[in-house]
């Protein structure tokens, strides 16, 4: 998760970003990176040093970073959230600010319990921070992320929403969905790159088995997948696209029959369903959840 935070910071700093058309009144102009690992400072500085924006790195000092920030990005492991938010002084330092969480499976309600454990029976304090849940993915490194912003209740102010959208539009595309859709969004968008990478690798393996050099096979598979997604994003329905390529008696329909006989369609759909359940369980603090279903 640290790499995701680094890539989002890198993209937000970039002048080549393509943000949401609605520009917030204030945009990020200074960046503070907090990490518990001493070696992270050198990595962050190396990754972001060529951007002409102030950058400050802190090790084992989240409190100072939160105090100095207007908007805070929480990008630790899900199981580390309670310790970070429950640390002395963090609640006061976050008062009136926006906290953006990219933790898989962890709900806004859970984060509120970690941050305000003494207030849950009587309600949140008036100066409570606004917690926003967002699910980006690793393609943020190349500004091709698919980020899902949870629709907050009550809604964010116009400027808060514009700021969060601006930040994540800088690293790719953004959609807003209700809280009930966040676990499946984690499975499809957060875990999706790994699933699609496996499919891409399998296609390249098949081509290598039939004589293509590895480098060319990987390039061809990646570009073919990229071109296909481009057509879909341009409005082409996947089923229509598939049929357009499938001439009667041709090699495409022959290959598709192998996929259908192997129930690949159902396996891929089940992959998303399984990952959704796992994301939900991880957010509740469960362990070894991948060994509980068959």
Which residue ranges define each predicted feature?
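Eukaryotic N-terminal low-complexity, Ser/Thr- and Lys/Arg-rich leader segments
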Residues: 1-29, 48-56, 63, 89-93, ...
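NAD(P)-dependent Rossmann-like dehydrogenase/reductase catalytic/cofactor-binding core
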Residues: 219-294
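Internal alpha-helical scaffold of NAD(P)-dependent oxidoreductase catalytic cores
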Residues: 110-130, 146-184, 196-234, 278
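Small-residue helix-packing motif on alpha-helices
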Residues: 40-41, 65, 81, 213-221, ...
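Short pre-catalytic strand/loop immediately N-terminal to key active-site residues, enriched for Gly-Thr
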Residues: 132, 182-187, 238-243
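Rossmann-like NAD(P)(H) cofactor-binding subdomain of soluble oxidoreductases
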Residues: 24, 32, 38, 43-44, ...
């Amino acid at each position: 998760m640290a790499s995701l935070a680094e890539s989002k910071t890198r993209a937000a700093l970039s002048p080549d970003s393509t943000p949401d058309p609605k520009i917030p009144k204030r945009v990020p102009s200074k960046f503070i990176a907090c990490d518990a690992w001493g070696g992270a400072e050198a990595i962050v500085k190396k990754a972001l040093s060529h951007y002409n924006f102030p950058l400050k790195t802190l090790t084992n000092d989240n409190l100072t970073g939160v105090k100095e920030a207007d908007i805070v990005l929480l990008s630790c492991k899900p199981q580390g959230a309670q310790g970070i938010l429950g640390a002395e002084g963090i609640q006061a330092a976050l008062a009136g600010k926006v906290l953006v969480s990219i933790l898989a499976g962890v709900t806004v309600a859970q984060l509120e319990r970690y941050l305000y454990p003494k207030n849950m029976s009587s309600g949140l304090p008036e100066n409570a921070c606004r917690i926003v849940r967002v699910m980006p993915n690793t393609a943020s490194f190349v500004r091709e992320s698919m980020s899902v912003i949870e629709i907050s209740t009550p809604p964010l102010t116009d400027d808060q929403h514009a700021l969060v959208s601006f930040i994540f539009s800088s690293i790719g595309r953004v959609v807003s969905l209700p809280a009930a859709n966040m676990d499946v969004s984690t499975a499809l968008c957060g875990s999706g790159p790994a699933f699609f990478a496996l499919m891409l690798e399998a296609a390249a393996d098949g081509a290598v088995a039939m004589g293509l050099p590895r480098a060319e096979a990987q390039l061809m598979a990646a570009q073919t997948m990229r071109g296909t997604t481009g057509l879909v994003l341009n409005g082409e329905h996947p089923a229509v696209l598939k049929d357009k390529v499938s001439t009667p008696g041709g090699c495409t329909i022959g290959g598709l029959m192998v996929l259908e006989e192997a129930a690949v369609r159902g396996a891929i759909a089940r992959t998303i369903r399984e990952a959704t359940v796992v994301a939900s369980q991880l957010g509740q603090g469960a362990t070894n959840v991948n060994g509980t279903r068959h």
